[in-house]
C-alpha cells in the first residue's frame, strides 16, 4: 500500500514536435502502435495519423495513344510521408499524370495480372504477377495479383486473359477500393492518442512484399510537463455505470443501465490566483500526468480541456479546483 505523500500532478506546458515515424503492426493488422506517446492534441501541435493510400484522382484508362497493352494514369494525390516529394508536415504528395504504362501479358498462359503502382520515388510503375491458366485472388500466387514493394501504393490492376497483344479494354481495368486500390482512408480507423495507437475497422490487406500491410505513419508532438504544486485530491476521469428499472404488470421488473464518462479534477493552492502559469492553460486541450509517487514508475495520463473554479478566502492563500473535460477515460501505465 502506498501512502500518497510524494504524488505529483503535471500539465502539458510545452510540446516537442516529432517527424513522421512508422507505426508498428501489433500482429492482427488492425492495431498499429507508436512507441512515442502520448500525443499532444493542443492547437498547433495536433497529431496526424497517415495510412498510405490514394487521396484523389488516379483513374486508369486505356492508353490514349492506343498502344498495345498500355494504360494511362490520371494525375493524383496520395498520402505517403516516406515517399520522395511528400510534404514533411502532411505526408501528401502530388503525382503527375503518367502515359503508356505497359501491362504484361502471359507468354504461354493467358491469365496475368499487373498492378499499377506508385513507388517510393513517386513514380508510376507497373508490377507484373505470374501467369496461369486462371485468375487467382491470392497475392503472389500464379494468376494472382503480385505482392508490391513496401512503400508503394497500388492504384489499380490490369487483368489480361489472352497472350495476344492488343489495346487494353476498359473491362480489363480494375480499381475497387480495398481489393484493387489502396486508399488512405480505407478502412476507417479510430485513434487513441494517450496509448499511441490506432485501430482499423478491419484488417489491412497483406499485399506488400513479405505479405505485410501498407505503411501507417504518424506525426506527433510529445508533451513537456510542468509540475503543479501544491496540489491534492486528484480524481481521474473514470467511466461509471448507473442502473435503473421499470415496473410492469404481474410484478415484472425490467432493468437497464447507462454508461457515462466522468471528468478528472484536482485541487490546487495558487500563488495569487491571477498570474499563476496554469491559469493560462485553461480552455486548452492538454495532457495531464498524475504520478502516485514521483520516485516510482507508475503514472496516469488524462487528456482534456481544463476549467477552473477559484476561491479567494480572506486571510488565506487562493485555492482552486481544476476540472478536466475528456473524450476518453484516464489511462494507467505501469512504467
Report each predicted region and the residues it spans.
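Charged, amphipathic alpha-helical segments
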Residues: 88-102, 261-277
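Solvent-exposed edge beta-strands and adjacent loop segments
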Residues: 215-267, 303-318
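Short beta-strand and beta-hairpin "edge-sheet" elements
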Residues: 289-334
Amino acid at each position: 500500500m502506498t501512502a500518497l505523500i510524494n504524488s505529483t500532478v503535471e500539465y502539458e506546458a510545452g510540446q516537442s514536435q516529432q517527424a513522421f515515424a512508422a507505426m508498428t503492426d501489433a500482429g492482427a493488422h488492425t492495431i498499429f502502435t507508436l512507441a512515442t506517446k502520448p500525443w499532444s492534441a493542443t492547437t498547433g501541435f495536433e497529431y496526424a495519423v497517415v495510412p498510405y493510400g490514394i487521396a484523389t484522382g488516379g483513374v486508369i484508362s486505356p492508353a490514349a495513344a492506343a498502344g498495345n497493352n498500355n494504360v494511362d494514369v490520371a494525375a493524383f494525390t496520395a498520402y505517403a510521408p516516406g515517399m520522395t516529394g511528400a510534404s514533411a508536415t502532411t505526408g501528401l504528395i502530388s503525382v503527375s499524370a503518367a502515359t503508356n504504362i505497359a501491362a504484361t501479358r502471359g507468354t504461354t498462359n493467358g491469365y496475368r495480372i499487373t498492378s499499377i503502382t506508385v513507388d517510393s520515388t513517386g513514380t508510376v510503375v507497373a508490377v507484373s504477377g505470374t501467369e496461369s491458366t486462371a485468375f487467382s485472388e491470392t497475392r503472389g500466387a500464379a494468376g494472382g495479383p503480385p505482392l508490391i514493394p513496401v512503400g508503394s501504393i497500388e492504384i489499380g490492376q490490369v487483368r489480361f486473359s489472352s497472350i495476344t497483344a492488343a489495346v487494353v479494354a476498359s473491362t480489363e481495368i480494375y480499381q475497387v477500393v480495398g481489393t484493387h486500390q489502396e486508399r488512405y482512408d480505407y478502412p476507417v480507423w479510430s485513434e487513441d492518442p494517450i496509448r499511441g495507437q490506432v485501430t482499423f475497422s478491419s484488417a489491412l490487406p497483406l499485399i506488400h512484399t513479405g505479405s505485410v500491410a501498407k505503411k501507417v505513419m504518424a506525426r506527433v508532438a510529445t508533451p513537456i510537463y510542468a509540475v503543479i504544486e501544491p496540489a491534492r485530491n486528484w480524481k481521474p476521469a473514470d467511466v461509471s455505470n448507473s442502473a435503473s428499472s421499470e415496473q410492469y404488470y404481474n410484478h415484472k421488473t425490467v432493468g437497464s443501465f447507462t454508461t457515462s464518462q466522468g471528468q478528472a479534477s484536482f485541487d490546487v493552492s495558487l500563488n495569487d490566483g491571477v498570474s499563476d502559469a496554469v491559469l493560462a492553460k485553461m480552455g486548452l486541450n492538454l495532457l495531464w500526468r498524475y504520478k502516485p509517487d514521483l520516485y516510482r514508475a507508475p503514472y496516469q495520463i488524462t487528456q482534456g480541456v481544463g476549467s477552473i473554479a477559484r476561491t479567494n478566502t480572506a486571510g488565506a492563500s487562493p485555492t482552486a479546483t481544476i476540472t478536466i473535460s475528456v473524450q476518453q477515460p484516464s489511462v494507467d501505465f505501469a512504467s
